[in-house]
From Swiss-Prot:
One of its GO terms (biological process) is methylation. Catalyzes the last two steps in the biosynthesis of 5-methylaminomethyl-2-thiouridine (mnm(5)s(2)U) at the wobble position (U34) in tRNA. Catalyzes the FAD-dependent demodification of cmnm(5)s(2)U34 to nm(5)s(2)U34, followed by the transfer of a methyl group from S-adenosyl-L-methionine to nm(5)s(2)U34, to form mnm(5)s(2)U34. This is tRNA 5-methylaminomethyl-2-thiouridine biosynthesis bifunctional protein MnmC. SUPFAM superfamilies: FAD/NAD(P)-binding domain (SSF51905). It comes from Shewanella sp. (strain W3-18-1). The lineage of its organism: Bacteria, Pseudomonadati, Pseudomonadota, Gammaproteobacteria, Alteromonadales. PANTHER family: SARCOSINE DEHYDROGENASE-RELATED (PTHR13847), TRNA 5-METHYLAMINOMETHYL-2-THIOURIDINE BIOSYNTHESIS BIFUNCTIONAL PROTEIN MNMC (PTHR13847:SF283). Its main location: cytoplasm. Keywords: Cytoplasm, FAD, Flavoprotein, Methyltransferase, Multifunctional enzyme, Oxidoreductase, S-adenosyl-L-methionine, Transferase, tRNA processing. It catalyses: 5-aminomethyl-2-thiouridine(34) in tRNA + S-adenosyl-L-methionine = 5-methylaminomethyl-2-thiouridine(34) in tRNA + S-adenosyl-L-homocysteine + H(+). GO terms for cellular component: cytoplasm. Residues 273-680 are annotated as: FAD-dependent cmnm(5)s(2)U34 oxidoreductase.
Amino acid sequence: MTAEPNKPCQIKRDYPQLINLYPATAHNDAHYLSKLSIYQQRVFEAHSQQKLLVLGQMGLGNGLELLSWWRTQTNPNQRLLLKVFEPHPINAYELKLLWDQSASLAKVPELELLAQRLLHTEPTAIIGCQRLIFDDGRTTIDLHFGDIQSQLSSLIHSPLHPVQHWLVLPHLQNGLHQQIHWQMAKLSDDSATVATIGLNESSGLSETTVNRFQACGFEVRDFTCAEIQTNPQPDAILLHERHVLRRQDAKAYAFNPMAAILSSDAPSSIAIIGGGLASAHLALSLAERGQSTQIFCKDAKLGQGASGNRQGAIYPLLTPENDELSRFFQQAFLFSRRRVQALTSAPAPNQTPISHNFCGVLQTAHDERSQLRLDKIIQSQNWPSEIAYRVDAQQANCLANINIDKSGFFYPLAGWVCPYEYAEAALQKAQQLTEVKLHLETEILEIEHQSEGWYLITAKHRFGPFAQVVLANGAALTQFDASNKLQISPFRGQVSHVPAQFQLSQLATVLCANGYLTPSHEGLHCLGASYVKEPKHLDFCPQEQQENLAKMHESYPDQGWLDDIDMSGNNARVGVRMVTRDHFPMMGCAPDVPKIIKDYAQHQLTKESRHYWQTTPAPVHEGLYILGGLGSRGLSSGPLAAECLAAQLCSEPIPLDKATLCKLNPNRMWLRKLLKGKSL
């Protein structure tokens, strides 16, 4: 169940405003959709041999083109990635209002069904990319909201899977300037084509726009043309300009190494070390791409580490600046939420149970400093109401269903999820899609790189070789020689389990202040958590149990329901989360720290050193990757980090911008200093 925002916050634009921003392409939808379907079928037929077809669309319009692409994708041996660029962000409520008021879906029941599935994913009006995955990965839709040139220029060219074809909707056809055309060209295959929609003379492309597209090497045709060219021969000079753009991009971000490009037709042997949320979701994202994996877990079952809690809050981390950290966590939270929905709503027998409740999260302050911080977050941005909105004390009491008597910030799409069930469900789905071999009670003590690949060594066995190995082993992330220099710290967390009774049992949303308190699940609330750096042991600690209770008293003083929190049973769970200083997860190539230090000695604080580090690929351990450092918000960040690493391992477009990828890179702590000309 999703907590609903109040109506005044939810409705920001009425139908006349929406239809102006997201115009229908044609008034006669049935006739237009018939021609559109024929055109889209030709596109799929022209690229039928590709296992992944990447298409681009300029403009969302009223959404019919997007839905029609989805409907037309019927090839069971091909996956579709549709990237839609729309300058005006829109949310699910407004999309539904647009479709209901226009009745554009009334006569197309097959599109109406897809529209309902799209709305179920709760697209939100945030800047950046939202990845929506349907049909076990056969159809993926990337919604890029915000300034189109900014969105295009922020993306990395995918050499193996570039955009093969573009559809430009009429209301944007003559408004895209030359810089946008070049950015489209940068992300496209050298033989990519552009289709426009000219239903009448007034809606066609201007001669200037046609010339601009052609000046970037694009073949431009109306969508009604009988033939889709798949191998036009662009001008060699224009192709050179595209390649220069890509090289400039690659050079500017050389310090942020990506996975080595592998053949898309040759499956790679991938080993994942770890048995928690990160491992399971990486296996799922790879399985959706048809890639088999082997998982090595030291425990008797999944989710015995930081992923083993009964309940965990899932909500975005927001900052006053809405910087890369804030934008990443919004994207990641929404992606994870959609994963939970997809796993729990799949048709039987593929449905996988996950205890969860999207009952909302209510964030409040607990002292003067935290109040100033929360006020700054609330007031500094015009946050979409589906992300979060301010509530007064009376509204907060109503949402919590118990008295807290404090104003706060309410996240209506958020809530709680059972982490270990979430991990188990992801693995179960992955095993339904492809071969995923799970090695339980198999502790990897050492990893070794030879010319033929990586070997994993236990006390009794040696596994391998593997072309790619991912370290997703949580608290043990730094146990190997190749990873022991990672700048990441372990923090102990004790979560208290308290009986649901009296007023406390009525709690209806997750409370987050100095610590958190969840609604009851199977007769218990979760209250936590302690935060102890580099713990000496993982035994139950009575002092931390009392500290958890004290945090609630500090957060909500003098409330009667505090007396209902019974700690006498000493019921708790202790885990370790790995935390980075900047709160970003670690995702990407494992840095070769000794080599970085060695190179630093040769390029230390000279005039050329900053340029060297900016333009030289940073040293990495070939074929070794890191997925960890999820901290206290792994439920929100883990699945998207895993999805992005899976895309990287398979040389596919990544649903994050270049700046955010740099923030996630495991080498960032060293490179941040080196790029500024500072000493290590």
